[in-house]
Structures are given as C-alpha cells and as structure tokens.
C-alpha cells in the first residue's frame, strides 16, 4: 500500500508513489517514485481497481487542494514548474485540506536499491515553515485514513464497491 502524490502540470497529473505517505515534519524525507502521468479525471476517482491491473487496489482521495509553484533560479527569477520538475528540483506551496505549506520534490540517482533504469526516484520534503509539525505521527495510517472528498475509509470504499479488503 502507498500514497499517490499528484500535481496537475501541463494538462496531466504528474504522479509519484510515496510508500510511507507525505509528512509535515521537515526532518522526514519521503521516498517518492515517479509513476506514469495520469489523466485529470483521476483527481476525483475513488473506487476499486481490479487486482493485477496497473494501480490495482482500493483508492481514495486522501487530500485535495491547490498548489502554488515557488521554484526560482539562483538569481531569484521564477522558473516554470514543468521546467523545475525537468531540472529535478521543484518547490511549491500546498493549500490542501490536510497538507499545508511549502514542500519540495528533489530527484536523485540510485540509493537504497532503487537504482532501476527508467525509474525516477525523488524525495518529497516538507520545508521548515509555520505549517510544519515536529511531533505526533510522522506518517498517515492508510487503514485509518479518510477521503478528503467523501470521508470514507479504504475499507468502506472496498465494501461499497464489492472489492473486499483494501
């Protein structure tokens, strides 16, 4: 089980699988493995994807909101967000229902057995800002997580969709 972190960029949802989920603690760096771009319709999808298919399992929208690009070059000139991602480091401000404040996505090569050709490995990092936390759980519990859209848990979605356990 993992969290998908998605940002709308260039008419698609750029997507990363975040195994431990996002953290609002700046000391916690989260592995984020780039996945294929998703269509915009995935912003609202909740349901069960058949096991064995890409992304198979139960899906909820854990958080939703808007983001504001913050990336700039060394002279302080703003860098378009798509370019910042291509360059391997993008900063942004999240105004979500659950996640708030400045975050960064930083691409790196290799590490921890994830040096797979064609696989982009990133870190999702919370900035030290007024929205950061330093105590409490460092990762959302996927079994207790509730949808930002419907308030349902994974188990409720699975039961309602006839998909069994999440």
Where do the model's predicted regions map?
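A charge-rich, low-complexity, intrinsically flexible signal that marks solvent-exposed coils, linkers
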Residues: 1-166
